[in-house]
Amino acid sequence: MRLQRERPQDAERLVTKIRGYEIALQDEAFAYVAHHYPDTFLISAKLLWKGISRTTPRFNAWSESWGGDDTLFNAAWVAENVQNKGPLGKVYPNADYLWEGDTPSFLYLVPNGLSDPNQPHWGSWGGRFTAEKVENILTGTGNDTVDPLLEQHRPYQMFSDAKDSWTHEEQEYNNEYATVFRWRRAFQNDFAARMNWSITEEFTKANHHPRVVFNGDASKSVVELKAKSGTSITLSAAGSSDPDGDSLAFRWWIYPEPTLANRSDDSLSQWTSWFSTLSGTETKLQLPKVATPTSYHVILEVEDSGSPSLFAYRRLIVQVMP
């Protein structure tokens, strides 16, 4: 507050650098900040954090948030892959409610090539959020302690939960929790691999992430390009490698929700037919015909054959021009 009074321009510049991600609106802190400093970049994982893992039998609530492969984060999985792995694993606690409820805030920042922390609506291991800030959000759980405190700070705005449509073993989901649990296999394998790293000094005794090259670019940055409506472009992962010499599986897909953002596009339901192949190191993408500039989010997902298998990604945003 002193900085704001004495050097308002510096205060404004500082605010633009702040990034915040909170879980479940457990207090009024973010509402206070958002009210007094409306330009602050704040994300509220209002409910989607529940998608990180299934609640324990002892608690057994929030069934609406269950989805994906729950065997990848239950007591048996934790015992085998975490608690049984060295001194760190020994101090890992059992869950009273659910495991890692706050971890989506960390997963949001993991630099795996999938996401950009400055673009909350693009989606990440830590969930996907709205493209625009939402006004005066409450806990969503009827918390009669926190909700009145939040209301004292109106008006305030934050990015908050968005929904993904995702299918797993013929079960269709369309909710905010799916923006997290759709990635469970990937982030749980990552967790298991890191525990393995903690118990060996030999590189060859643990698995490591693939290194993905996209159209000659070996960084983890999002690639953006423009292309003509109705034309075909070649997408290549040639040069991708694995530090352990594992074989690699390549998957090409379009992420519908960040592609659609605030528009509708019935043709997007046919996106699988736009690719010459959905696997392999190279594919051709037949671009749709558009009347106005339209962006499509293409994901290259690479999985190695190690144990546990590990994932890496690249994201291409193709702006299709009329």
Which residues fall in each region the model found?
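N-terminal acidic, glycine/proline-rich low-complexity segments
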Residues: 1-234, 240-243, 247, 254-265
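Hydrophobic core residues within well-ordered beta-strands of beta-rich domains
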Residues: 233-234, 248, 296, 312
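Short, surface-exposed loop/turn segments at beta-strand-coil junctions that are enriched for proline
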Residues: 287-293
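Extracellular and select intracellular beta-sandwich modules with Ser/Thr-enriched
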Residues: 309-316
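Short beta-strand edge segments in extracellular beta-sheet folds
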Residues: 317-321
